[in-house]
């Protein structure tokens, strides 16, 4: 008769089928697991370093924006009192100078146009 056993609907035959791990395989598996754990910890450490640097840079940006906001608040308070802060005055005078330079470059020079119109009129 057949020496096979029925377990959970499957027929199992006696004997050594498949691969049984040897002690060497267990040691190798344990070493691979340890190496994988070391690599995982290293990746985790790098990820946390990156995140900490990101947080610190964002905190610096927030501080700079808060200082800028405070400066603008002070400018607004000064203008409410009828004073024009020197920084705004410098910005305004700088814009006026830029506009005057742009206006002078847009209009052609008078000497060239007069010469051209005179030569046309003379013909």
Swiss-Prot record:
Q: Keywords, A to Z?
A: Activator, Differentiation, DNA-binding, Nucleus, Phosphoprotein, Transcription, Transcription regulation
Q: What is the lineage of its organism?
A: Eukaryota, Metazoa, Chordata, Craniata, Vertebrata
Subcellular location as annotated: Nucleus
Q: Which cellular component terms (GO) are annotated to the entry?
A: nucleus
Q: What is its main location?
A: nucleus
Name of the protein in question = cAMP-responsive element-binding protein-like 2
Q: Where is this region: Disordered?
A: 1-24, 93-123
The Basic residues compositionally biased stretches are 10-21
- Which gene underlies this protein? Crebl2
Gene3D superfamilies reported for this sequence: 1.20.5.170
Q: Which GO terms describe its molecular function?
A: DNA binding; DNA-binding transcription factor activity
């Amino acid at each position: 008769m057949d020496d096979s056993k029925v377990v959970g609907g499957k027929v199992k035959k006696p004997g050594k089928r498949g691969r049984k791990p040897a002690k060497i395989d267990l040691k190798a598996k344990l070493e691979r697991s340890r190496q994988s754990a070391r690599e995982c910890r290293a990746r985790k450490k790098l990820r946390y370093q990156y995140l900490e640097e990101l947080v610190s840079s964002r905190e610096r940006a927030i501080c700079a924006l808060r200082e800028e906001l405070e400066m603008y608040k002070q400018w607004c308070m000064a203008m409410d009192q009828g004073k024009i802060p020197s920084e705004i005055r410098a910005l305004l005078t700088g814009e006026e100078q830029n506009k005057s330079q742009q206006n002078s470059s847009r209009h052609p020079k008078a000497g060239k146009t007069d010469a051209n119109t005179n030569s046309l009129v003379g013909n």
